[in-house]
Amino acid sequence: STSEVYGDPEVHPQPETYWGNVNPVGPRGVYDEAKRFAEAMTMAYHRYHGVETRIVRIFNTYGERMRVDDGRAIPAFMSQGIRGEDVTVFGNGLQTRSVCYVSDLVEGIYRLLLSDYSDPVNIGNPHEITMLDLAKEVLEVLASSSAIVHRELPEDDPKVRQPDITLARRILGWDPKVDRREGLIRTAAYFRKKLS
């Protein structure tokens, strides 16, 4: 699943017990509601048919193997910064996200798969950063002199996004290990190679 099930959250950080704040008819609604429906169907099969299931709510993830034209923030910041283009930040950039390096995500999913826990579990790095500061950090890692430009914030874009990983820590003994800056350095090396 995804952290998008929380929509534009009114509870911060978001625990698995929070049901979310989703605009079902907004431009993001189809994706958000599809994930919520998938979770409901998964739990129904688990309850009524005894199917062994796991639900991982993945928060913003980054790392090597991302597509250069992915459209998400880190690939966009990396690609624009490496090419010397203006780096696009939506809105004032004060909306927050918590980005998790891919190897940490994989470890969390692996531990969940090996567990017998069937309810949703948040897997993400709880260290929150504004999108503006994330763009600046990417440019710093790249040693890029690209300018940051602001564009209109898309409708229903969440103002905050931060996982409460208390449950993952308790039942999986999981905690992210890779520091954001270290992850960005590794990701930048990959993007430089892809764009050369």
Question: What do these predicted regions represent?
Answer:
Residues 15, 60, 79-196:
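C-terminal substrate-binding subdomain of Rossmann-fold SDR/epimerase-dehydratase oxidoreductases
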Residues 5-6, 54, 61-63, 105:
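Conserved sequence/active-site signature of Rossmann-fold short-chain dehydrogenase/reductase
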Residues 66-70, 98-101:
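Nucleotide-sugar-dependent glycosyltransferase donor-binding/catalytic pocket residues
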Residues 36-43, 75-78, 106-107, 132:
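Conserved active-site helix of classical SDR/Rossmann-fold NAD(P)-dependent CH-OH oxidoreductases
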Residues 1-3, 57-59, 124:
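Active-site beta-alpha turn of Rossmann-fold NAD(P)-dependent dehydrogenases/reductases
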Residues 71-72, 129:
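Conserved catalytic/ATP-binding subdomain
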Residues 4-55, 69-70:
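Catalytic helix-loop patch of NAD(P)-dependent Rossmann-fold dehydrogenases
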